[in-house]
Amino acid sequence: MATHPKHIHFIGICGTAMGSTAVALRALGHNVSGSDSQVYPPMSDVLRDAGITVTEGYKPENLPPDADVYVVGNAISRGNAELEALLEKKLPYVSMAEMLKREVIQGKRSFVVSGTHGKTTTTTMLAWIFEHAGKNPGFMIGGVPENFESGARFTHSDLFVIEGDEYDTAYFDKRSKFFHYLPECAIVNNVEFDHADIFDDLDAILLSFRRFLNLVPRNGLVLINGDDPNCLSLREKCPAPLKTVGLGPACDLRIQITAATPESTMFSINGDPFEVPMVGEFNARNAAMCVAAARFAGLSDDEIRAGLVSFRGIRRRQQERGTTNGVTVIDDFGHHPTAIRETLRGLRQRYEGRRLWALFEPRSNTSRRNVLQDELID
């Protein structure tokens, strides 16, 4: 990780990932500035409290002449006034993913959590297991974790946990973001068709995941969902050691659900007992992935158990907002049919015997298209 202070300017700083990265780099001692088309709370408050100067609106004069590098957000495209000025002046620029690679991940043990669903929960859970064990990990999470003050933290620990998104990187780099994250341990929770705005079909997504796994060194580890046929198809020609994790009898690390309550799930992995304060097989599998990754990092099962049982989850992941007149309101971020299905299955376990009403807002690019309409109806 780079140690000498730099001036880093973010174009599109108010996005969740860009803002979190900016704050974490500021905490390392870098001089950070940025701009965005709209600057408003809560991100504007977070950036201000971190001592970051933010300019509203995109103008060529916003570009600080003394900046060492300019970070171009994924939402920025040609025609943006600052981007056009940056290109004309031939100033050095990178994507956010490349900035993370250069300034944060290089030289560390990088644990990259990927997959269509469960990335944020699994990333946060693994980071918390490391934190609870006193490892002081760095992390980059695409959500708001309850166990940490923010979604990003960069430390001098050799452990770094990051959510590996298969979405593209920037207007000038159409590779998936996870190609930049130097995985020593790669987790693939599941693979389904998503991001219809950039992938033509499932085969295109699988190709991106195969190329991602090709980055894992021979002394690393690949963990895949052994219950997912698409994940199992990734085994062929994978150059790194690979283990399957799942409930099926053929899995290398076999999960068995031993008990469940409305608040937690007890399970075993090849006979070793664990507990996670979340409901559903889906979350038991997420937790089992974390167990395997933490073991690879050198943690004992007792350290892992202590981290798991104290995990508090993510905001907007089956988050209870309150109860009025006997009606409990739950907020969840899931938008893919499988994520919705698993969320409802978990809620039926958590609120057994109660009637469920589901209100769905199609906000993602894929959910607003007709490619998944039949699955959404089901």
Task: Describe the predicted segments one by one.
Residues 41-49, 62-72, 77-95, 101, ...:
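Acidic, Mg2+-coordinating active-site environments of NTP-dependent enzymes
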Residues 54-58, 94:
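Short acidic-hydrophobic, aromatic-tinged amphipathic segments that line or gate anion-handling sites
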Residues 9-10, 24, 96-145, 255:
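Walker A (P-loop) phosphate-binding motif
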Residues 159-169, 329-335:
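Switch II (G3) loop of P-loop NTPases
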Residues 4-22, 31-38, 314, 338-378:
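Active-site beta-alpha connecting loops in nucleotide-dependent enzymes
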Residues 154-156:
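Conserved motor-coupling elements within RecA-like helicase/translocase cores
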Residues 31-36, 138-139, 244:
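Short beta-strand "acidic-cap" motif of Rossmann-like dinucleotide-binding folds
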Residues 168-182, 338-346:
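Switch II of P-loop NTPase G domains
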